[in-house]
């Protein structure tokens, strides 16, 4: 069989390695630039490739595995679909090769999915073998190459990956919540929600669908779900959560993880999370300067995620919004800001989108040309008992490689200021 890999990110690199092992023919098409390391790998393995372009040579393949972020209306992929070619992404395509039949738990959602995946994996691993895969963790092709054969695979899957997949049937599907997100990629909110709901589209009544009963977008489509429907609810007190992960966001994340464990028939107790390592860039404490506490929430890349983060604060907050917006409505975020924030710093392209909402509500704000300037000015204003939050509400690509690089830069700035 002939394969074309559209984009050579981490998942398609492992796809290439696994397909080589099977002796399949591969062609790689990368619209950007390939690193010298990638070129060396392709040349060593006699894999033909092109860079700086996606040509019609892709259409010679029987199966096209695309990088998830490739636009949904990419002309080559539209043509491939018209020609009846099989288009998929690495994560769902290689599921069929998992011959030891592990249980697949798949998680999607606009906010909290990575933490929920990490918690589910942590809790399962107390009593069984488990591996995180997908968007976060290692690619499915890498799981196959490593040959460890875990009993459970916990997969984080995005709306992009779900949009591209022709078939995906996890044993347990989880939607944490659905808020407007990625509307710079999806042409409409409906397109986004339809993509999310593909997580349960091919499930039957042998499978389980774990959902948030408070989420309106999920609720509207519940009747379409063929799997056994299991709502997750917060049936514990905030104070019961281990202190190091005690945030408002984690109440729902823990409730979802606990429900998945119940569905799988595995043990759960809150004490099992005592040694859970929280993920960086999610309400991550960075330090205290002049009595003001600094938090890095660089992963909050949309308005809804920042609204969630604001639930942790009273009205003593300095907020930094930064990055590239996603074509969202900022009314709800601006309403929360007007109640909670003493001052808002806005940085980058998102400033133009957010500024009118802040002006309308008489919020005290100022534009800055970068995060460093914003933190420096805030450090002169924030006093004992105040909080400073990097809650970007936008993607990082305007100034950084990814949200991790942005969060690490923020942490470095805070560290420098702490050292005086």
Swiss-Prot record:
<keyword id="KW-0963">Cytoplasm</keyword>
<dbReference type="GO" id="GO:0008360">
    <property type="term" value="P:regulation of cell shape"/>
</dbReference>
<dbReference type="InterPro" id="IPR036615">
    <property type="entry name" value="Mur_ligase_C_dom_sf"/>
</dbReference>
<dbReference type="InterPro" id="IPR013221">
    <property type="entry name" value="Mur_ligase_cen"/>
</dbReference>
<comment type="pathway">
    <text>Cell wall biogenesis; peptidoglycan biosynthesis.</text>
</comment>
<dbReference type="Pfam" id="PF21377">
    <property type="entry name" value="MurD_N"/>
</dbReference>
<dbReference type="GO" id="GO:0005524">
    <property type="term" value="F:ATP binding"/>
</dbReference>
<dbReference type="GO" id="GO:0051301">
    <property type="term" value="P:cell division"/>
</dbReference>
<comment type="function">
    <text>Cell wall formation. Catalyzes the addition of glutamate to the nucleotide precursor UDP-N-acetylmuramoyl-L-alanine (UMA).</text>
</comment>
<dbReference type="GO" id="GO:0009252">
    <property type="term" value="P:peptidoglycan biosynthetic process"/>
</dbReference>
<keyword id="KW-0961">Cell wall biogenesis/degradation</keyword>
<comment type="similarity">
    <text>Belongs to the MurCDEF family.</text>
</comment>
<keyword id="KW-0133">Cell shape</keyword>
<dbReference type="GO" id="GO:0071555">
    <property type="term" value="P:cell wall organization"/>
</dbReference>
<dbReference type="InterPro" id="IPR005762">
    <property type="entry name" value="MurD"/>
</dbReference>
<keyword id="KW-0547">Nucleotide-binding</keyword>
<keyword id="KW-0132">Cell division</keyword>
<protein>
    <recommendedName>
        <fullName>UDP-N-acetylmuramoylalanine--D-glutamate ligase</fullName>
        <ecNumber>6.3.2.9</ecNumber>
    </recommendedName>
</protein>
<dbReference type="Pfam" id="PF08245">
    <property type="entry name" value="Mur_ligase_M"/>
</dbReference>
<keyword id="KW-0067">ATP-binding</keyword>
<dbReference type="GO" id="GO:0008764">
    <property type="term" value="F:UDP-N-acetylmuramoylalanine-D-glutamate ligase activity"/>
</dbReference>
<dbReference type="InterPro" id="IPR004101">
    <property type="entry name" value="Mur_ligase_C"/>
</dbReference>
<dbReference type="Pfam" id="PF02875">
    <property type="entry name" value="Mur_ligase_C"/>
</dbReference>
<keyword id="KW-0573">Peptidoglycan synthesis</keyword>
<feature type="binding site">
    <location>
        <begin position="109"/>
        <end position="115"/>
    </location>
    <ligand>
        <name>ATP</name>
    </ligand>
</feature>
<dbReference type="GO" id="GO:0005737">
    <property type="term" value="C:cytoplasm"/>
</dbReference>
<keyword id="KW-0436">Ligase</keyword>
<keyword id="KW-0131">Cell cycle</keyword>
<dbReference type="InterPro" id="IPR036565">
    <property type="entry name" value="Mur-like_cat_sf"/>
</dbReference>
């Amino acid at each position: 069989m002939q394969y074309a890999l559209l984009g050579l990110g981490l998942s398609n690199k492992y796809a290439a390695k696994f397909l080589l092992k099977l002796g399949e023919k591969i062609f790689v098409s990368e619209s950007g630039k390939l690193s010298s390391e990638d070129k060396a790998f392709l040349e060593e393995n006699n894999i033909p490739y092109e860079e700086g372009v996606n040509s019609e040579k892709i259409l010679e393949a029987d199966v096209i595995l695309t990088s998830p972020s490739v636009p949904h209306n990419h002309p080559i992929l539209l043509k491939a679909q018209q020609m009846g070619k099989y288009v998929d992404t690495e994560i769902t395509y290689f599921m069929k090769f998992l011959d030891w039949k592990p249980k697949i738990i798949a998680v999607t959602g606009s906010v909290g999915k990575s933490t929920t995946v990490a918690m589910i994996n942590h809790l399962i691993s107390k009593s069984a073998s488990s591996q995180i895969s997908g968007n976060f963790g290692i690619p499915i092709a890498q799981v196959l190459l490593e040959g460890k054969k875990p009993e459970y695979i916990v997969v984080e899957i995005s709306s992009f990956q779900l949009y591209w997949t022709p078939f995906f049937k996890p044993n347990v599907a989880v939607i944490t919540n659905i808020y407007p997100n990625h509307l710079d990629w999806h042409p409409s909110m409906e397109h986004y929600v339809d993509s999310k709901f593909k997580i349960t589209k091919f499930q039957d009544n042998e499978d389980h669908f774990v959902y948030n009963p408070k989420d309106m977008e999920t609720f509207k489509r519940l009747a379409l779900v063929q799997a056994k429907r299991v709502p997750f609810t917060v049936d514990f007190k905030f104070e019961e959560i281990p202190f190091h992960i005690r945030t408002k966001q984690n109440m729902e994340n823990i409730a979802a993880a606990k429900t998945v464990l119940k569905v799988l028939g595995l043990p759960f107790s809150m004490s099992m999370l005592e040694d859970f390592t929280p993920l960086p860039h999610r309400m991550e404490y960075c330090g205290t300067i002049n009595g003001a506490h600094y938090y890095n929430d660089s992963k909050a890349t949309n308005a809804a995620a920042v609204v969630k983060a604001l639930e942790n604060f009273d009205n003593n907050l300095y907020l930094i919004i930064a990055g590239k917006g996603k074509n969202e409505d900022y009314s709800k975020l601006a309403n929360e800001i007007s109640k909670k924030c003493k001052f808002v710093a806005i940085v980058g392209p998102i400033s133009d989108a957010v500024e009118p909402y802040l002006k309308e509500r008489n919020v005290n704000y100022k534009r800055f040309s970068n995060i460093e300037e914003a933190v420096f000015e805030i450090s002169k204003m924030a006093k004992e008992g105040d909080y400073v939050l990097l809650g970007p509400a936008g993607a990082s690509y305007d100034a950084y490689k990814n949200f991790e690089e942005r969060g690490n830069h923020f942490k470095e700035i805070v560290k420098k200021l702490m050292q005086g």
